[in-house]
Amino acid sequence: MAFLLFFVFVTAAVLCFVVPAFLLLCTSVQRRRDVGQGGGRDWQKKKKLRLPPGSMGWPYVGETLQLYSQDPNVFFASKQKRYGEIFKTNLLGCPCVMLASPEAARFVLVSQARLFKPTYPPSKERMIGPSALFFHQGEYHLRLRRLVQAALAPDSLRALVPDVDAAVAATLAAWSGGHVASTFHAMKKLSFDVGVVTIFGGRLGRRHREELRTNYSVVERGYNCFPNRFPGTLYHKAIQARKRLRAILSEIVAERRARGGGGGGGGDDLLGGLMRSRDDGTAGAVALLTDDQIADNVVGVLFAAQDTTASVLTWILKYLHDSPKLLEAVKAEQMAIYVANEGGKRPLTWTQTRSMTLTHQVILESLRMASIISFTFREAVADVEYKGFLIPKGWKVMPLFRNIHHNPDYFQDPQKFDPSRFKVAPRPSTFLPFGSGVHACPGNELAKLEMLVLVHRLVTAYRWEIVGASDEVEYSPFPVPRGGLNAKLWKQEAEEDMYMAMGTITAAGA
């Protein structure tokens, strides 16, 4: 009965709210395709190509109900088992081609990336901002990507270690005390704080920080809702909060310009780089980025920095908790650094984070196992041939990262959590936790730094206990343990810390 009620609920939700949002988008895809079938030898050649195998399901709805009524990973895995590494389906009214091989992922994301553009529903672009870099291709995207990469390069991250460490320390201190809390929610707060310090440096006042946090949380709650602008709906509230974010960011930018004098003002952080960045206009003139462009990219970076990283951090805590021997080995590695820093009296350094070999392997294996980004969306900008199959113009194309990460051909015994597999680098294009190509996540090193610092602080100064069942997974929209992994956290006494440190290191060296 519970399953029946769940199925009825999902069916009603999809038919009444989700599907209509995508029908207009995908109707235009079919129209463009009809126009593009004008003929000539090229079209006759493409007509002879086969579409990939697969099922398109029911008209308009496609196989959306099958996807949403079961674990999406089971859905995609069963499709691959039946049809192979390239197959078609119809989701939310959109025809899609799924690709589950490293070669196909590289084809779409790297070698032939010009034939596939990033695609997002218009409601998502409105929420984040149409000028955010990951909605674009071409010169504008490359210019902004270079700027973001410069702000997140090793030299820049080296200076951020104390700020990241302080954010981690504050998050764990607020959580400790033995009360039950959602790990995911605690990690979201941490990731937001790290995102803020990355964008604004140490220059953001408490008022602006809290205003950003409050309004961003409203935007986040409405991001995945049906785009209904009726007053009182989550989406309408999110749109209003997004407008307030724009006003807050304009105020921050204006204050910086007033302090910084001419030009773009700013500073050495990401916001300063955005304020100094110049954009080539249509007439070839050079102009500073507008306040709208700056705001869109700040919100975009906050969005990219929070939920995905928080999800991985949550899984790391679970995997370590469920692997006691591995946890002891990680403690030994981190306690050696802790003792070298005189029991935490000296600050953690960038060089020390580079020496955390086992912890880094744990992070990589957590990224593989959890596969937070299970797939990515692209859209074919032309009819494309791949391995004898036709990918029609306008169809959605989805490289399935999770299927690749869990393929025993590339990772032996893929359902086993085994960090030692990363003692050897994986084969090219088989490990894609941050995507690949020009649209790969530019903040991957920042995310890994946050994870390394969190593990260091956690295992050297705290102990934790998971409360309740943690094997079920929920999608919100990224996979996390059910309920966000409820857990208790306790601070260890300083004397106990040093005793454990000496004992752990001695045992590890025996």
Curated annotation (Swiss-Prot):
Gene3D superfamilies: Cytochrome P450. It is found in: Membrane. It is a single-pass membrane protein. Keywords: Heme, Iron, Membrane, Metal-binding, Monooxygenase, Oxidoreductase, Transmembrane, Transmembrane helix. Its main location: membrane. Pfam families: p450. This is Abscisic acid 8'-hydroxylase 2. Its EC number is 1.14.14.137. It catalyses: 2-cis-(+)-abscisate + reduced [NADPH--hemoprotein reductase] + O2 = (+)-8'-hydroxyabscisate + oxidized [NADPH--hemoprotein reductase] + H2O + H(+). Signal peptide: none annotated. Belongs to the cytochrome P450 family. The keyword Electron transport does not apply. It comes from Oryza sativa subsp. japonica (Rice). Its cofactor is heme. One of its GO terms (biological process) is abscisic acid catabolic process. It is an enzyme of class 1 (oxidoreductase). Heme binds at C441.
